[in-house]
């Protein structure tokens, strides 16, 4: 498989108080936030519109399970179904089933240290249609 990961889709982390931490990042680092955190919009080397999501989660979230780590990374991929098939053949632990939404497909794996990694195959036309970059 030629292209596996095409970019960083997001960085998610646990915190005691997501609203308070978003306010801190807004006040001290100038990151405007919304209910999910913040989406950084950018263009790749070919001029395609892209995004990276930064999101604090409540410390008791189960979204990172079965990992017990304080963070989870999301990587953008081109062909999630094929990639998960290849990763499974390589012995990588796959978590759950592929989930599909109007903005993309998602799958999850564990790295050797138990970090849950989210893989995202975005659907750009739906997710980016109102963004003027």
What are the residue ranges of the model-derived segments?
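Acetyl-CoA-dependent GNAT
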Residues: 58-60, 96, 121-123
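Core segments of cupin and vicinal oxygen chelate
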Residues: 2-6, 12-55, 89
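Active-site beta-strand termini and strand-to-loop segments that position acidic
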Residues: 42-47, 109-112, 122
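Conserved beta-strand in the GNAT
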Residues: 52-55, 108, 118
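N-terminal beta-strand motif that seeds the catalytic metal site of vicinal oxygen chelate
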Residues: 1-22, 70-75, 123-133
């Amino acid at each position: 498989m030629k292209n596996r990961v095409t970019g960083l889709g997001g960085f998610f982390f646990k915190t005691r108080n997501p609203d308070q931490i978003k306010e801190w990042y807004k006040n001290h680092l100038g990151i405007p936030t919304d209910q999910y955190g913040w989406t950084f919009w950018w263009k790749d080397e070919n001029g395609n519109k892209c995004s990276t999501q930064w999101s604090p989660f409540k410390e008791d979230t189960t979204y990172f399970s079965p990992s017990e780590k304080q963070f989870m990374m999301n990587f953008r991929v081109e062909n999630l179904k094929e990639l998960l098939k290849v990763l499974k053949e390589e012995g990588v632990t796959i978590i759950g089933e592929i989930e599909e939404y109007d903005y993309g497909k998602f799958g999850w794996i564990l790295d050797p240290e138990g970090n849950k990694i989210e893989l995202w195959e975005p659907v750009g036309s739906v997710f980016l249609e109102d963004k003027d970059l």
